[in-house]
Amino acid sequence: MLDNSFYTAEVQGPYETASIGRLELEEGGVIEDCWLAYATAGTLNEDKSNAILIPTWYSGTHQTWFQQYIGTDHALDPSKYFIISINQIGNGLSVSPANTADDSISMSKFPNVRIGDDVVAQDRLLRQEFGITELFAVVGGSMGAQQTYEWIVRFPDQVHRAAPIAGTAKNTPHDFIFTQTLNETVEADPGFNGGEYSSHEEVADGLRRQSHLWAAMGFSTEFWKQEAWRRLGLESKESVLADFLDPLFMSMDPNTLLNNAWKWQHGDVSRHTGGDLAAALGRVKAKTFVMPISEDMFFPVRDCAAEQALIPGSELRVIEDIAGHLGLFNVSENYIPQIDKNLKELFES
């Protein structure tokens, strides 16, 4: 186990953990003691009909959701709903390569985990800890959108509403190549040592390279041309790296990022229907608003729209934002108001 203050409540905000026991993985591995970190807001009502699940995205935790999306002035209103954000397996807070006490799966030996494994684990936690068997809604961004799609395809009778934001039900070839490049940024660092480093600081050069790759692709070309980084209080394009992305990514655990990236690469709900994506999405019963971000270079509108057309009764709600994919961090003034408007309408449906 490695010490890394980035993955603590002091940095990420309060959370709890719960063990769901032995989890057999789709790829054949096993996590003997699978425990998940989660954070909640609001009160579960008597008939347990007001629960909203928020899965987490690549490199992220519940923190951004609680800081930017949840509040009595937002659609995700804890005075109305019981909101639970469950950190995905391998994200640094839930059981992960660097925090497991099981030496057989620590560090480079941590098994490959699929999106489906996360959803099965989340379902088990919700039942075990709260007695929740149905969800008012699932809302997730990026890899959280992948998990949202998995929920509504795997458990179509358990989810009443869904909002996948800036993500797809089946990963695209472009994103597969991009995530492979993300992996190479850290794997090429000699300090990575095949995943058996003794501190994330030994992989500083690789983590910095990953930060720079996110700067190039995570923010759109318009974000840079219009100097939209000024809204973040930054003084130059160089400070986007030096004062924002570099400190963020250089605090992270490399094996955690690799585990997340493999999962992202292999996200595909059509595994439930023999590779037939239309059949998989045709199973969805939840009222679904698909919300791509207009300038997203990972999950462009046309990819999300093509999937939305396969979901019965769904709607395409494009979020207009020049920030691109990292607009998920609430970079632009008009971002959260659009999210809130769409979610409020979805929740009232």
From Swiss-Prot:
Pfam family, one: Abhydrolase_1
GO molecular function: homoserine O-acetyltransferase activity; hydrolase activity
Record Gene3D superfamilies: alpha/beta hydrolase
SUPFAM superfamilies: alpha/beta-Hydrolases (SSF53474)
TM regions (residue ranges): none
Keyword annotations of the record: Hydrolase
Record-stated family: Belongs to the AB hydrolase superfamily. Acetyl esterase family.
Chain's role: Esterase that catalyzes the hydrolysis of 4-nitrophenyl acetate in vitro.
Name this polypeptide is given: Probable esterase Cgl0839
High-level lineage: Bacteria, Bacillati, Actinomycetota, Actinomycetes, Mycobacteriales
